[in-house]
Amino acid sequence: MNKRDKQLQRNNIAQLLRISNRNRNVLKWSPNETIAHINMKFEICKQLKIWGHEFYTEAIFADSGLRADVIDADEAIIYEVYQTEGEDSLMRKAASYPLEVRFIAAGQRFEEK
């Protein structure tokens, strides 16, 4: 992907998000998240930064109000960290998001390539 196409992709992803949630390349978390959940989000963001990708955390989609753990704006992928959610809940969540979703278990090693 050339530089222009990459920027268009990033802009398209940003347009899906509420204006107040367009803080790129910033790790955000809530006090309700476990340490394992926060650490996994950090590992994902760290790898995305190494790759030179733009990302958003805790971003809210404008149309649905859904909140994503981490969005890779370069690849249009949502990373959702889970600990106790059941498979049916994860599948419903994946069907609701406007982008591809990859579920990552908290407490495990992040090994995307």
Which residues does each PLM region occupy?
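Interdomain/boundary linker segments immediately adjacent to catalytic/signaling cores
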Residues: 1-46
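Solvent-exposed, charged interface segments at domain starts and junctions
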Residues: 1-6, 54, 72-74
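Generic structural motif recognizing short loop/turn segments at the entrances and edges of beta-strands
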Residues: 22-25, 51-57, 97-100
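Short beta->alpha junction loops/turns
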Residues: 33, 63, 83-84
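Catalytic cores of nucleic-acid endonucleases
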Residues: 39-46, 52, 75-113
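A short acidic/basic microdomain associated with nuclease active sites
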Residues: 45-64, 69
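Short acidic loop-to-beta-strand element that houses the catalytic metal-binding Asp/Glu
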Residues: 64-80
